[in-house]
Amino acid sequence: MNDLLRFSGAVRRDPDVDAWFDADDGLRAIARPWFEQMRGCGDDVRELMADGAPTACVGDAPFGYVNAFSAHVNVGFFYGAMLDDPAGLLEGAGKRMRHVKLRWGRPINDAALSELIAAAYRDIGVRLGEVARQGGPKTLL
């Protein structure tokens, strides 16, 4: 479990993330409260823009992101494949990453998505602790 993706340059509050949300794009407004939840997970949360998307990290290890597309918003999780998802919100087929798609006019299971965000934050904390116990990270980036 020590293969952790790492991003350098994460900071407490990244002005590039704020600029992304300030752009004139209605779908970004849908993404904002979910990223705010990620920001609020703990004092150790940092952020940066990664691949054009606001990304939340603990230290340099990402746990979540949001992104806006032409018809939907993704709320994504870097280790989402390992998260418990009793509401069945997560989509994707990759080895690790999963996302929840949000669309205009479709209901959102706020409680379940909030729990996924909290679970992703807790999960990255466990992963970071596991890395420390194993003598340091083997990074993927």
Roles of regions detected by a PLM:
Residues 1-141:
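Charge-dense, helix-prone N-terminal extensions
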